[in-house]
């Protein structure tokens, strides 16, 4: 892929030339060592896979030592590809996963201001999401609605699903490249405005779009303590009847990589848009072709229509608009979803896989599944 092919004929988005310089290097992974093999999965552009070259090099002690010895090379590959998959190593536990993550980056964080329900496993390790297995999680950069999102993410296949349940990833630099200019220009200029509603402690309301309670997010039932973090994050807030909380904030929609300087699509517009799940499920059903998938797709379309008919957009559980407050049209959100699926990369989990992601370059999501599956996550500051 040449650099010039990444730049539109109109001459806009000059920063994408930097992206091109990174992306064109993907065709030639750095040299495989005698200890660890490096390769791309057939048909995919990412992640780059690291695997032990022999069984005796699959144990945890070897892996942590190899990471320490080759840290600079690993970071170089992460900068270029945006995602590295450690496959074939014997991890075995959440504690060992945490050790590997700390070896890759010692700046792990416990703070989580995202919307998904998660269970804590160790100091820095949580389950990736406790959302129902039939529900898709759209592509997103982790906590992109914050001023300072995590720089890196780590996913661990504690229990790999037998079928489906993949964690697709997408290069956000190519998403920005392929986004029509009438959308990308607006998002880059205005950013995205987010409106989120959180139930209070003990609430039992059911909604497909419901976030976790505010006391779980802020780890306190004291409103004054919650307000301290709200102020720190530059959120506007309003306490609503029934002990509910509304949070409003505006954030950039395109971010520069702190090291590479390359630009990437970086927002939760499709994740928080009411039409996204049903649009996403069209692709899910096309891929999985299950009776359950068809049923969920039809139900999502019905429930979305009812929700839009009887709810104001500003009262939805989660909502995203352009930065000036204008609605992201159904046509625009459909285009955004289509661009992601044009560039999405999907691989099947294997037990003990660790996926290392540059959160400023690569997004992630989740496809529906049936049966056992436990993917764990850790993230940096």
Regions found by a protein language model. Give the residues of each.
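Glycine-rich loop at the start of a catalytic domain that most often binds anionic cofactors/ligands
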Residues: 91-106
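TRNA-binding/sensing appendages of the translation machinery
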Residues: 71-90
